[in-house]
Amino acid sequence: MPQPDFRLIRLLPLAALVLTACSVTTPKGPGKSPDSPQWRQHQQDVRNLNQYQTRGAFAYISDQQKVYARFFWQQTGQDRYRLLLTNPLGSTELELNAQPGNVQLVDNKGQRYTADDAEEMIGKLTGMPIPLNSLRQWILGLPGDATDYKLDDQYRLSEITYSQNGKNWKVVYGGYDTKTQPAMPANMELTDGGQRIKLKMDNWIVK
């Protein structure tokens, strides 16, 4: 199988992205109990969203490679979503479309790949072991299958620790966008050993 060329994405300058600046800061104060009714209500409000989309800055950093890009994430239904990675000029480097039982990925040369597991396919084709199946929940501020997590003083996720398939992911939320209801994550960082994934969301559209 031909391998897609992601060199353009890897060579994008870090200066083209603003991953650390964010107008929303994490609330200070002691964390709240995961058993609190406020947290249960927040989770339910997020799960009630039928459609949503967000765009922003993405970075994957490891000893082997550094990838910087813009991203666009759109969920249109249960297990139906679209992920775009683009360079600063707006050209698409990767497009992924997923629906139940079928995932299609198109690289920057127009080569099309098909599989039934998006996480596995992205890992094989890009060399980035992104925990996409869990990230679909984490990016919404939901713990997914994780049971080890902490809340901030506004009853929202502040930190997750999750182990699966030999990976030990730690997720730290840097703030929330309170312009949307419910409030959605504004930036987050995932770490596993020597690899890091950073996401900064510019805005959210939720329905």
Curated annotation (Swiss-Prot):
Organism, as annotated: Shigella sonnei (strain Ss046)
Signal sequence extent: 1-21
Keyword Electron transport: no
Keywords, alphabetical: Cell outer membrane, Chaperone, Lipoprotein, Membrane, Palmitate, Protein transport, Signal, Transport
Gene3D superfamilies named in the record: Lipoprotein localisation LolA/LolB/LppX (2.50.20.10)
Lipid moiety-binding residues (S-diacylglycerol cysteine): C22
Name under which the protein is recorded: Outer-membrane lipoprotein LolB
Major location category of this protein: membrane
Family: Belongs to the LolB family.
